[in-house]
């Protein structure tokens, strides 16, 4: 039984930055540091930061006045920012810069009075934050999850219209949605290329290559991780048994029946230590070789806030 590792896999630049912001804030200011929502969607990462003194909350009313709070990588609405300012909270913003780019697109549409359509998953923190950048009551922003949602949009063809997407979607699904939007609204405007982030795109391409050679694909990532779920779905669509796991403890021996090659990848919020723990566990179950697929190199780095960067240099 062989193990094949996808490349690239695991942490992206936005996740690296978000985790660094929490760790550096704890180092500079000491515990407790409050974090609104899980800074990234991975249970292992969140538990590790809790042990270091981070306190995770869902809403700002759980944060004491004048405390330090970090916004998660998924971003927040303008209403949340305004509440933090009103209460005198010191904020470090760990929003992924690629999410911030989408926020700016929405804010521009709102300012111009252009109706906006967001392709995304209802209830996901990134979507909530992105929708919350639109404040023009004379126009509006609409969320669509399916082609059927697009067919039912109550927007006239002659209206000014723009679209944007959640950054962690399936590339294949999103291209079909964009095509449906352009068919219904030929004059619709949008980004020059879709908003799906480089890391999501790269990991989806890597899992395609993995699924061509493996009979089982294990995706290391938490159940609430959008990009991890998309990786498992993509491998499954290619006819391969695919399982989303938090770690080696989730692996069932029967998954390995008649399997010669196991492919392993990890979502953008899953640390490499979890991948290696899965490899080690599979070796105890009979895996004899480990190889890395050749994939694209990622060199993207996002800087942490200046106040924390000074400390980082020291």
From Swiss-Prot:
<dbReference type="GO" id="GO:0051745">
    <property type="term" value="F:4-hydroxy-3-methylbut-2-enyl diphosphate reductase activity"/>
</dbReference>
<feature type="binding site">
    <location>
        <position position="124"/>
    </location>
    <ligand>
        <name>isopentenyl diphosphate</name>
    </ligand>
</feature>
<dbReference type="GO" id="GO:0016114">
    <property type="term" value="P:terpenoid biosynthetic process"/>
</dbReference>
<feature type="active site" description="Proton donor">
    <location>
        <position position="126"/>
    </location>
</feature>
<feature type="binding site">
    <location>
        <position position="197"/>
    </location>
    <ligand>
        <name>[4Fe-4S] cluster</name>
    </ligand>
</feature>
<feature type="binding site">
    <location>
        <position position="226"/>
    </location>
    <ligand>
        <name>dimethylallyl diphosphate</name>
    </ligand>
</feature>
<comment type="similarity">
    <text>Belongs to the IspH family.</text>
</comment>
<feature type="binding site">
    <location>
        <position position="41"/>
    </location>
    <ligand>
        <name>(2E)-4-hydroxy-3-methylbut-2-enyl diphosphate</name>
    </ligand>
</feature>
<feature type="binding site">
    <location>
        <position position="226"/>
    </location>
    <ligand>
        <name>(2E)-4-hydroxy-3-methylbut-2-enyl diphosphate</name>
    </ligand>
</feature>
<comment type="pathway">
    <text>Isoprenoid biosynthesis; dimethylallyl diphosphate biosynthesis; dimethylallyl diphosphate from (2E)-4-hydroxy-3-methylbutenyl diphosphate: step 1/1.</text>
</comment>
<feature type="binding site">
    <location>
        <position position="41"/>
    </location>
    <ligand>
        <name>isopentenyl diphosphate</name>
    </ligand>
</feature>
<keyword id="KW-0411">Iron-sulfur</keyword>
<dbReference type="GO" id="GO:0019288">
    <property type="term" value="P:isopentenyl diphosphate biosynthetic process, methylerythritol 4-phosphate pathway"/>
</dbReference>
<feature type="binding site">
    <location>
        <position position="96"/>
    </location>
    <ligand>
        <name>[4Fe-4S] cluster</name>
    </ligand>
</feature>
<feature type="binding site">
    <location>
        <position position="227"/>
    </location>
    <ligand>
        <name>(2E)-4-hydroxy-3-methylbut-2-enyl diphosphate</name>
    </ligand>
</feature>
<feature type="binding site">
    <location>
        <position position="269"/>
    </location>
    <ligand>
        <name>isopentenyl diphosphate</name>
    </ligand>
</feature>
<dbReference type="GO" id="GO:0051539">
    <property type="term" value="F:4 iron, 4 sulfur cluster binding"/>
</dbReference>
<feature type="binding site">
    <location>
        <position position="74"/>
    </location>
    <ligand>
        <name>(2E)-4-hydroxy-3-methylbut-2-enyl diphosphate</name>
    </ligand>
</feature>
<comment type="pathway">
    <text>Isoprenoid biosynthesis; isopentenyl diphosphate biosynthesis via DXP pathway; isopentenyl diphosphate from 1-deoxy-D-xylulose 5-phosphate: step 6/6.</text>
</comment>
<feature type="binding site">
    <location>
        <position position="227"/>
    </location>
    <ligand>
        <name>dimethylallyl diphosphate</name>
    </ligand>
</feature>
<dbReference type="InterPro" id="IPR003451">
    <property type="entry name" value="LytB/IspH"/>
</dbReference>
<feature type="binding site">
    <location>
        <position position="225"/>
    </location>
    <ligand>
        <name>isopentenyl diphosphate</name>
    </ligand>
</feature>
<comment type="function">
    <text>Catalyzes the conversion of 1-hydroxy-2-methyl-2-(E)-butenyl 4-diphosphate (HMBPP) into a mixture of isopentenyl diphosphate (IPP) and dimethylallyl diphosphate (DMAPP). Acts in the terminal step of the DOXP/MEP pathway for isoprenoid precursor biosynthesis.</text>
</comment>
<dbReference type="Pfam" id="PF02401">
    <property type="entry name" value="LYTB"/>
</dbReference>
<feature type="binding site">
    <location>
        <position position="74"/>
    </location>
    <ligand>
        <name>dimethylallyl diphosphate</name>
    </ligand>
</feature>
<feature type="binding site">
    <location>
        <position position="167"/>
    </location>
    <ligand>
        <name>(2E)-4-hydroxy-3-methylbut-2-enyl diphosphate</name>
    </ligand>
</feature>
<feature type="binding site">
    <location>
        <position position="41"/>
    </location>
    <ligand>
        <name>dimethylallyl diphosphate</name>
    </ligand>
</feature>
<dbReference type="GO" id="GO:0050992">
    <property type="term" value="P:dimethylallyl diphosphate biosynthetic process"/>
</dbReference>
<keyword id="KW-0479">Metal-binding</keyword>
<feature type="binding site">
    <location>
        <position position="269"/>
    </location>
    <ligand>
        <name>(2E)-4-hydroxy-3-methylbut-2-enyl diphosphate</name>
    </ligand>
</feature>
<feature type="binding site">
    <location>
        <position position="124"/>
    </location>
    <ligand>
        <name>(2E)-4-hydroxy-3-methylbut-2-enyl diphosphate</name>
    </ligand>
</feature>
<feature type="binding site">
    <location>
        <position position="12"/>
    </location>
    <ligand>
        <name>[4Fe-4S] cluster</name>
    </ligand>
</feature>
<feature type="binding site">
    <location>
        <position position="225"/>
    </location>
    <ligand>
        <name>dimethylallyl diphosphate</name>
    </ligand>
</feature>
<keyword id="KW-0408">Iron</keyword>
<feature type="binding site">
    <location>
        <position position="225"/>
    </location>
    <ligand>
        <name>(2E)-4-hydroxy-3-methylbut-2-enyl diphosphate</name>
    </ligand>
</feature>
<feature type="binding site">
    <location>
        <position position="226"/>
    </location>
    <ligand>
        <name>isopentenyl diphosphate</name>
    </ligand>
</feature>
<keyword id="KW-0414">Isoprene biosynthesis</keyword>
<keyword id="KW-0560">Oxidoreductase</keyword>
<keyword id="KW-0004">4Fe-4S</keyword>
<dbReference type="GO" id="GO:0046872">
    <property type="term" value="F:metal ion binding"/>
</dbReference>
<feature type="binding site">
    <location>
        <position position="124"/>
    </location>
    <ligand>
        <name>dimethylallyl diphosphate</name>
    </ligand>
</feature>
<feature type="binding site">
    <location>
        <position position="74"/>
    </location>
    <ligand>
        <name>isopentenyl diphosphate</name>
    </ligand>
</feature>
């Amino acid at each position: 039984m062989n193990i094949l590792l996808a490349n690239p896999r695991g942490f992206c630049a936005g996740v690296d930055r978000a985790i660094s912001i929490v760790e550096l804030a704890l180092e500079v200011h000491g515990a407790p540091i409050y974090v609104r929502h899980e800074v990234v969607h991975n249970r292992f990462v969140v538990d590790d930061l809790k042990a270091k003194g981070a306190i995770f909350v869902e809403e700002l009313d759980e944060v004491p006045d004048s405390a330090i709070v970090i916004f998660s990588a998924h971003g927040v609405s303008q209403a949340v920012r305004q509440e933090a300012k009103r209460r005198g909270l010191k904020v470090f913003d760990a929003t992924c810069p690629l999410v911030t780019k989408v926020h700016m697109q929405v804010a521009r549409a709102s300012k111009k009075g252009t109706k906006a359509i967001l392709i995304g998953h209802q209830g996901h923190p990134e979507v909530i934050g992105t929708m919350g950048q639109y404040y023009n009551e004379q126009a509006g922003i609409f969320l669509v999850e399916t082609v059927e949602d697009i067919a039912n949009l109550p927007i006239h063809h002659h209206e000014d219209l723009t679209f944007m997407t959640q950054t962690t979607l399936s590339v294949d699904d999103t291209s079909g949605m964009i095509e449906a939007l352009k068919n219904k609204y030929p004059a619709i405007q949008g980004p020059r290329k879709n908003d799906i982030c480089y890391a999501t795109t790269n990991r989806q391409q890597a899992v395609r290559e993995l699924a061509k050679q493996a009979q089982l694909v294990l995706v290391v990532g938490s159940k609430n991780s959008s990009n991890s779920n998309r990786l498992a779905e993509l491998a499954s669509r290619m006819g391969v048994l695919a399982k989303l796991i938090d770690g080696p403890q989730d692996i069932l021996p029967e998954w390995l029946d008649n399997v010669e090659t196991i492919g392993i990848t990890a979502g953008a919020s899953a640390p490499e230590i979890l991948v290696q723990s899965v490899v080690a566990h599979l070796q105890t179950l009979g895996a004899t070789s480990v190889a890395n697929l050749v994939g694209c190199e990622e060199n993207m780095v996002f800087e942490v806030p200046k106040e924390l960067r000074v400390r980082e240099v020291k």
